[in-house]
Amino acid sequence: MNDQFIQGVIFDWDKIGKDSYLKGIRAFKGVEKLDFNKPITFFVGENGSGKSTLLEALAVAHGFNPEGGTKNYVFSTHDTHSELCDAIRIAKGYRKEKWGYFLRAESFYNVATQEEEYADITHPSAKYHEKSHGESFLALAQNNMNPNGLYLFDEPEAALSPQRQLTLLMQIYRCAKEGAQFIIVTHSPILLGIPDADIYCFDNGRIHLCEYEDTESYQVTEMFINNRQMLLDRLLTG
């Protein structure tokens, strides 16, 4: 039985203008519905394949601030979200999340600033700007992850070392086991290795489920580690 907070998303492309750039994203063509059957779902694919666009639309349609944060965040520094949020309908489950967070690597600085401005006696500031970029990013993620929560993460590995990615991996896995749901855009072969997750690939002109070993993130990393010198010779010397 599917007991996820967001069980799926249904697309209505008639609500998108005929000249919208969204019509040019190959992976979106023909897609009518995506199902989220597991506590952890990954979106993978090449840059510009539409994965972050869809995650952002899911976040906005579900009530999150487009730039990130909780549903209570109301700030805006630059309005960049697409019209896709108006063309999707979220299929919600019978459970209601107790907490939620939309975390974006590209707007992390703005969110961290808002976290400090929203701080009070009961919720003191974690002073994210006094930490290194990677430390503050991981701290923000960890401080806002709880059981029975809904978390949408866009490239959370961007600021993290491989070791810190493993730390985040453990936290995500534990929270998912305790009733949380994660939908994550990533290029990280480390995060993608979390057991029992669904992986949606946005490459080859369609959105489809794939295995970990079939992701480009895994294949390119494996190729480089196992054949580094040969690969460098081909790339750098022709």
Predicted feature descriptions by range:
Residues 1-32, 37:
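N-terminal pre-Walker A segment at the start of P-loop NTPase domains
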Residues 40-42, 53-117:
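ABC ATPase nucleotide-binding domain signature region
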Residues 46-47:
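The conserved Walker
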Residues 50:
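Conserved glycine(s) of the Walker
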Residues 131-155, 163-175:
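GG-anchored amphipathic helix commonly corresponding to the ABC/SMC/Rad50 NBD signature/C-loop
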Residues 154, 184-185:
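Conserved D-loop beta-strand region of ABC ATPase nucleotide-binding domains
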Residues 163-181, 188-238:
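C-terminal lobe/lid and adjacent interdomain/linker elements of RecA-like ASCE P-loop ATPase modules
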